[in-house]
UniProtKB/Swiss-Prot annotation:
Keywords: Chaperone, Cytoplasm, DNA replication, Metal-binding, Repeat, Stress response, Zinc, Zinc-finger
Residues that hold Zn(2+) 1 according to the record: 165, 168, 222, 225
GO terms classed as biological process: chaperone cofactor-dependent protein refolding; DNA replication; protein refolding; response to heat
Cofactors that this protein relies on: Zn(2+)
Organism field: Bacteroides fragilis (strain ATCC 25285 / DSM 2151 / CCUG 4856 / JCM 11019 / LMG 10263 / NCTC 9343 / Onslow / VPI 2553 / EN-2)
Molecular function terms from GO: ATP binding; heat shock protein binding; unfolded protein binding; zinc ion binding
Binding note for cofactor: Binds 2 Zn(2+) ions per monomer.
Subcellular location: Cytoplasm
Disulfide bonds: none
Similarity comment: family membership: Belongs to the DnaJ family.
ZnF CR-type: positions: 152-234
GO CC terms of this entry: cytoplasm
The name this protein goes by in its record: Chaperone protein DnaJ
J domain sequence ranges: 6-71
């Protein structure tokens, strides 16, 4: 499958573009690739859906912030791979797109741009504003340890949610009674109201109060769901968490939220990532940090020590004369980037342990060593340490 394009590139806007500029850019793309203008052109249809997906993210402040920070992985859980978070366009019909972006298409419901598109009309008539109900989003939390974050992991969730009614299959109607065209709006989902003003008669189009914008009414309502088309149930969902996710990151799994009334558009499942603290390692973005406490003899004469990593312990050589504050870098032993670009390092911060109590023999030995010039810091060492200390205040 082709890799997803950058959403800003799709709409030909920049990260500094305002919501209004993004809306204008999307409107331009929607007109260019609209199915009515490009009948039978599959490539144009895909570009139309691609533009709609980009607009869905960039026009929403929360989604846009996640996308700016994490890229496609923040929206799809597996950057551009069409996985379980494959974005809304993969499972959305053209009618769904028109329904979600009614303010752009002037209430289109599948039969051309319609008269409500203002100065962008002319691709068919209708002015229909039939509405599809969208289910609400569901939110869950997932707690991950560093090992799971480093490799990616699948998690199963047992969700209590609204699902299509098992009796009426989501229609809301009892048996085969079905639905009837709304007598108020004649199926358009909207009504035009005339209002007298000092400038003359003003016409406004509003949602039909009888059918609530659906364009149809149910005479014989389902006995199980009461005509809503949904009931409370359960669903087990498997979520593939990508490697490199971070605390506070929110993933979105399209279409796995609450079902929409009357076979409407389902909401999304939003997964908030929480990170379990590691007993020895601290995370710093994609790097991991470990505080190594060396004994004085090992720091002085050198040796080998074991360092914990995500994949187990590794032996690291300690050079003779290793100073406190030195940082050893184990490349590639950190966490992968959630966007798939590179892996962090494991930074080993060296500290030297000074014993609090000594035996007589140990104290005597150290007193003898104290007289040695090698145990007295030279002027150059003092200057080096002072420069490092002063840099903390620059």
């Amino acid at each position: 499958m082709a890799e997803k394009r950058d959403y800003y590139e799709v709409l030909e806007v920049t990260k500094e573009s305002t919501v209004e500029e993004i809306k204008k850019a999307y409107r331009k793309k929607a007109i260019q690739y609209h199915p009515d203008k490009n009948p039978g052109d599959k490539e144009a249809e895909e570009k139309f859906k691609e533009a709609a997906e980009a607009y869905d993210v960039l026009s929403n402040p929360d989604k846009r912030a996640r996308y700016d920070q994490f890229g496609h992985a923040g929206m799809s859980g597996a950057a551009g791979n069409g996985g379980p978070f494959g974005g809304f366009s993969g499972g959305m019909s053209m009618d769904d797109i028109f329904s979600m972006f009614g303010d752009i298409f002037g209430g289109h419901s599948g039969g051309g741009f319609g008269g409500g598109f203002g100065g962008f009309g002319g691709f068919g008539g209708g002015g229909s504003q039939q509405r599809k109900f969208r289910g609400s989003d569901l939110r869950v939390k997932v707690k991950l340890n560093l090992k799971e974050i480093s490799t990616g992991v699948e998690k199963k969730f047992k969700l209590k949610k609204y699902v299509p009614c098992s009796h009426c299959h989501g229609t809301g109607a009892e048996g085969n009674s079905g639905s009837e065209t709304c007598p108020t709006c004649k199926g358009s989902g909207s009504v035009i109201r005339n209002q007298q003003t000092i400038l003359g008669t003003m016409q406004t189009r509003t949602t039909c109060p009888t059918c609530n914008g659906e364009g149809k009414i149910i005479k014989d309502k389902c006995k199980v769901c009461g005509g809503e088309g949904i009931e409370y149930g359960e669903e087990v969902v498997t979520v593939k968490i990508p490697a490199g996710v971070a605390e506070g990151m929110q993933l979105s799994m399209g279409g796995k939220g609450n079902a929409g009334k009357h076979n409407g558009i389902p909401g999304d499942l939003l997964i908030l990532v929480e990170e379990e603290p590691h007993p020895e390692l601290i995370r710093d973005e994609n790097d991991l940090v470990y505080n190594l406490l060396l004994s004085f003899p090992t720091a002085a004469i050198g040796g080998a020590v074991e360092i914990p990593t995500i994949d187990g312990k590794v032996k690291v050589k300690i050079e003779a004369g290793t100073q406190p504050g030195k940082v050893l870098r184990l490349r590639g032993k950190g966490l992968p980037s959630v966007n798939g670009y590179g892996t962090g390092d494991l930074l080993v911060n060296v500290s030297v342990y000074v014993p609090e109590t000594l035996s007589k023999e140990e104290k005597s030995t150290l007193e003898k060593l104290e007289e040695s010039k090698n145990f007295k810091p030279s002027t150059s060492i003092k200057e080096k340490i002072f420069k490092k200390f002063r840099s903390l205040f620059d």
